[in-house]
Every structure is written in structure tokens, then in C-alpha cells.
């Protein structure tokens, strides 16, 4: 898979794309109670944070997760408005290279 450093999503675009995918698929992958909780609390405590892919993704995918091209977006709720997300609803792995649409999601169980 050949990728171009000059053809990547920005960090903001990556966050936005991951959140859009999350919203589109949440109803099929989360319990109804979790969806209600997320929707009620997101305005005050919700967020999406961008990270380099965690090492445990290697258990789920069989390709190199070069952080120049792959990002992990954690979507969930924090205890406080500016706190770290500690109630995780989904972890989204995205390829940031625009010509390689690739996404994997680990949903809350």
C-alpha cells in the first residue's frame, strides 16, 4: 500500500470523519441505553480525542500501523468538561491517507 504524506487528512478532518462514522454506526453496535446516555451527556462531557494507534490494534489488523498514516480516535465521555475521556464508547482506527479509505472500530461491550 503506497501512501503519500502530502495527501493526508488533517487532525481535525480525522476527528470529524471518525465522529461521523461513529454516529452512523452507533445504533447498530451500542446498547440503546448507552446511546441514550451518550446523547444526553455528550454536550457537557463528551469528546473525541486523537492518538497514535495503540499497540493492541495489532491483535485486530494485519498491517503496519505507521502513525504517519494511521490514527486512533477515542470517542466517549469524561468525568468533567475538560477531563480525559474515561468512559469509552468506541475506539476508531482510521487511515489518514485520503486515497486509502480504511476504518476499524472497537465498540464498547
Swiss-Prot record:
Gene3D superfamilies in the cross-refs: dsDNA mimic, putative
Q: Name one Pfam family in it.
A: DUF440
Q: Which InterPro entries match?
A: dsDNA_mimic_put, Put_dsDNA_mimic_sf
Name the residues that span the membrane.
none
What HAMAP family does this protein map onto?
Put_dsDNA_mimic
Q: Which family does it belong to?
A: Belongs to the putative dsDNA mimic protein family.
Describe the function of this protein. Answer: May act as a double-stranded DNA (dsDNA) mimic. Probably regulates the activity of a dsDNA-binding protein.
Name assigned to this protein? Putative double-stranded DNA mimic protein YciU
- Recorded source organism is Salmonella paratyphi A (strain AKU_12601)
Amino acid at each position: 500500500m503506497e501512501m503519500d504524506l502530502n495527501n493526508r487528512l488533517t487532525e481535525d478532518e480525522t476527528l470529524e470523519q471518525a465522529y461521523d462514522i461513529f454516529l452512523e454506526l452507533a445504533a447498530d453496535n451500542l446498547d440503546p441505553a448507552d446511546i441514550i446516555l451518550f446523547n444526553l451527556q455528550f454536550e457537557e462531557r463528551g469528546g473525541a480525542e486523537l492518538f497514535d494507534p495503540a499497540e493492541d490494534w495489532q491483535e485486530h489488523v494485519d498491517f503496519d500501523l505507521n502513525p504517519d498514516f494511521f490514527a486512533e480516535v477515542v470517542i466517549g465521555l469524561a468525568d468533567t468538561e475538560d477531563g480525559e475521556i474515561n468512559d469509552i464508547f468506541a475506539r476508531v482506527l482510521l487511515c489518514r491517507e485520503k486515497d486509502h479509505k480504511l476504518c476499524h472500530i472497537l465498540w464498547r461491550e
